[in-house]
Amino acid sequence: GKKSDHCGYYVHLQPDGSMLAGGSLCLPTNILKAVRQSIYDNIEEFVAIVEDPEFKKYFPVIGEDFLKTAPKGFPKDFKYIDYLKCKEYVCSYNVPDDFFTRPDMLEQIDKVFRQFKRFADFINYTIDDFE
């Protein structure tokens, strides 16, 4: 099938390395630039999502593989420049080894991914414009 640039959901099971995660990896340059522009243009909405205490409880860090400096076309002194330095817009929540054997596992996964969905919806809204 065709690779989607949209945020996806990911469940990883590994001894001492299990996690619930999601995001968009390896975005084409034009889409990555558009996502950054969307964050910049709608920073209040983005911050309301990623700095919400319920969101941060599961996802304290946004992104992977960061630029060392501000991306081209964005002011270096932008208060939230770190959100624009992401090359991969992903979030992950590490879980203990016994997580997947707990009786409330599905409810817990639902809680985590409900928080992630707000982030995914924000990113996917921009990506939708490219389809």
Question: For the regions a protein language model found, what residue spans apply to each?
Answer:
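Aromatic- and glycine-enriched beta-alpha-beta binding-site module
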Residues: 1-40
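Surface-exposed, charged, gly/pro-rich loop-and-adjacent secondary-structure segments at domain edges
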Residues: 37-65
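Long, solvent-exposed, polar/charged low-complexity segments
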Residues: 38-40, 61-131
